[in-house]
Amino acid sequence: MPLICLEGASGVGKSTTAHEIAKLTNAYIIPEVNFLFERPSVESNTWYLERQVERWMMAQDKLKTYDTVILDGDIFHPFSYNWCFNFKIFNQNLELIANFYRKALKEYKIGFPEKYFYLYSDKETIRERKDNDLTRKRRNFEKHLGIVDSYTKYYNSLNEFLPQYVHFVEANKVEENVKMILGNLNSTTNLTTPYSTEFLEEIINWLANNKA
């Protein structure tokens, strides 16, 4: 029973695609942190990281009863997102984030999904979809659109360490996204364990030595 993650720019169609997969198959969706949890008035610099651990635990529980569990948004999101802003936001530098994940991984409180599916499209198409979607308000949309190239670069880098670990899906139509994802759901990768400390260290080293 695979645990997969859908990633991509805000507005590209991750949640819509995930919900369509759930309609067609026995799949459960773990929403992103901002949809699952109410943010406290005073937030520690590890609050968001701790919620990612909770998402992982939820996913492990749902894998007992569902054929597929979909992480709508990466549980390692603090790495990619903060890197795009040179680790100068949220009072979270690379060392803090890295040490948090090192500890959580060694304690089996968090791990890597079996495969990523990264949805992408050109910026104008993403902007049009956002304007046509009246169901959600997307805060800082233009700011997030501005980091798309760096964001994509990060997920490309994961394939340098684990070839074919991230499957890139050109997000033209939802039904095509679904077909592509379901067709590659059980394809193998070189990830031998979700708790790979070696893979984590490769990611941390790459982040430390590459600029967004």
At which residue positions do the language-model features occur?
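Loop/turn-to-beta-strand initiation segments
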Residues: 65-69
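P-loop (Walker A) phosphate-binding loop of NTP-binding proteins
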Residues: 9
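Conserved lysine of the Walker
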Residues: 14
